[in-house]
């Protein structure tokens, strides 16, 4: 079944509500100041990205913008966009992903409450880092993207 853009936007907002957004570093795009909206819109290809819905930021100014068709991030050097329909896996960056399924010494791994990046692998096995504030904001982004990915399957 083909989902409409309005349906996807409403689902993204619904899931964000479930995670208690907005927070200090996670926002609904429509609630942002006009200057911030304009800055972000100038960073993206609105035709391909769809409607911007959610913005996740870090105190160090990296950001991830969740749109109706793409997720876009910037580390202040480069901007990366990925079609939500192309997401294959979302993985933690806190430890070596080759160790998944094997015993891990938890003393060497950063606590989940300190995680602030996720690794999104696309269908072509390309890998990109996406940003959110540590802890709850990151897990909100992760779960919102998992749901969005399912909407496009």
Regions found by a protein language model. Give the residues of each.
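Phosphoinositide-binding peripheral membrane targeting modules
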Residues: 52-105
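Nucleotide-binding motor/catalytic cores of P-loop/tubulin-like NTPases across gene-expression machines
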Residues: 12-16, 88-89, 115-117
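Anionic N-terminal interaction surfaces
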Residues: 1-64, 121-122, 126-133, 139-140, ...
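Canonical pleckstrin homology
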Residues: 98-141
């Amino acid at each position: 079944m083909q989902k409409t853009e309005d349906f996807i936007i409403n689902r993204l907002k619904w899931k964000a509500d479930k995670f208690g957004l907005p927070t200090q570093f996670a926002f609904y795009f429509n609630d942002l100041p006009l200057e911030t909206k304009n800055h972000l819109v100038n960073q993206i290809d609105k035709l391909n990205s769809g409607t911007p819905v959610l913005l996740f930021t870090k105190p160090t100014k990296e950001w991830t913008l969740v749109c109706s068709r793409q997720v876009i991030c910037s580390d202040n050097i480069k901007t990366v966009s990925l079609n939500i329909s192309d997401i294959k896996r979302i993985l933690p960056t806190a430890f070596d992903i080759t160790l998944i399924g094997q015993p891990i010494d938890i003393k060497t791994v950063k606590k989940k409450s300190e995680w602030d990046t996720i690794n999104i692998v696309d269908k072509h096995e390309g890998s990109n880092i996406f940003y959110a504030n540590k802890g709850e904001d990151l897990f909100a982004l992760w779960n919102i993207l998992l749901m969005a990915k399912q909407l496009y399957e």
